[in-house]
Amino acid sequence: MTIYTPYWWEEAPRPDPPQTALADDCDVAIIGAGYTGLAAAIELARAGRSVQVFDKSRAGEAASSRSGGIGSGNLRLSFAKMLARLGRQKAEAYYREGIEARADLSRFIEAEGIQCHFDPVGCFIGAVRPAHYESLAREAELLNKHFDLAAFSVPKSEQHKEIGSDAYHGGMVRPDIAGLQPALLHQGILDCALGGGVTVHAKTAVSGIQREASGFEVMTVRGRTRARDVFVAGNGYTDAATPWLRRRLVPVPSLMIATDHLDPAVMDKLCPKRRMLGDTNRLHNYFRPSPDGSRILFGGRTAGRLAVDGPVPFAHLHNKMIGIFPDLAEVGLSHIWWGFVAMNIDHLPQLAVKDGVHYAAGFCGSGIVWARWLGRKAALKVLGDATAVSAFEGQPFAAVPFYNGNPWFLPAVVTWFKFLDAFGL
């Protein structure tokens, strides 16, 4: 029987603690109890600030516990394209911060003793076209030259050492990328926050933020509170309560499926090194073995619709998986689920302040790494820490033209990307 909730929830069900009364005031109010909001809350509480976190759902029920569990910290543009478009200084700054963010997440998990199956196994990125392989090989050379990441290209003749598939024309391995269990990671972060004195109000949607002389009034479905500072951390689940941010983020459905248990010999063939996996499609597939090595977890952004309702988009995703792994043609699915990632015009994470409200958003599908990193950076900004600099602050954060939060254009964009992928353009 197929279950329509994330596979990750089997090991880490979403918490549903009793609601507590809203405090009349606090130092900082945070909207969003995912990785981003809780990372900020932990930093602020440890600095002695009183913090209330509000979420319209259960804590971590949205993207934080629905992802593929691939800790890449990738940016949408390759380093080669960034060099060409932005120049060496900016390109290196963006990519270097990604390296720092990955290391920060690893240190945090170890320091807090979070048991989330964190495993730095690396990631193989498959080249969908021969020309893509040449680009990946060049990318590996550039990453090693500028950052010494030990990335390497894998020709098609040797790719079975990395993946049991003939769907690709070689690829690249990034050994600096880890896998983890995202719901367990969130549970560990939530425990840190609660243990540090943070108050989390789940199922408490924020309806508006009003600036006042001495701070802000935050309106919720359960009452009002006053805060000296406000941090918005909803990312792909941003709603009408924060219209300025909503006009700058496009929520894109990202789908995932989990296979039934597989024979160990099949797993050894398909994922011989148990790496994280991806490819070079514009509508790229991301997939991996489960942490216990018993299943394939497969994701993609091919819905082409504003909401996911019914089996059609999952059937398409299932067919994509079988195209890569024909061995799975007769294997059943144990779980199917979906969530939103947040895209923006520049395809870069953003750390911003507007009218006194702090924002971190636009992780473009790589939130496991960027959410904690920029959530913490935002907290340091609130604290007035002059050393909390980031390459992702102070850059233009443009609104999407003719858009107010309803991505009416998304089906056409996805159809166009499917066309480009089909012809390798």
Where are these regions (language model features)?
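Flavin (FAD/FMN) cofactor-binding and adjacent substrate-gating region
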Residues: 2-10, 77-83, 107-188
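Helical element adjacent to the flavin cofactor pocket in flavoenzyme catalytic cores
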Residues: 142, 166-228
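Glycine-rich active-site loop/strand segments that organize a redox cofactor
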Residues: 66-97
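Active-site substrate-recognition segment that forms the wall
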Residues: 103, 111-119, 206-208, 224-264, ...
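C-terminal catalytic lobe of FAD-dependent flavoproteins
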Residues: 304-310, 314-422
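Glycine-rich FAD pyrophosphate-binding loop
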Residues: 46-66
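Extreme N-terminal leader/targeting segments of oxidoreductases
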Residues: 1-28
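N-terminal Rossmann-like FAD-binding beta1-loop-alpha1 element of flavoenzymes
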Residues: 28-53
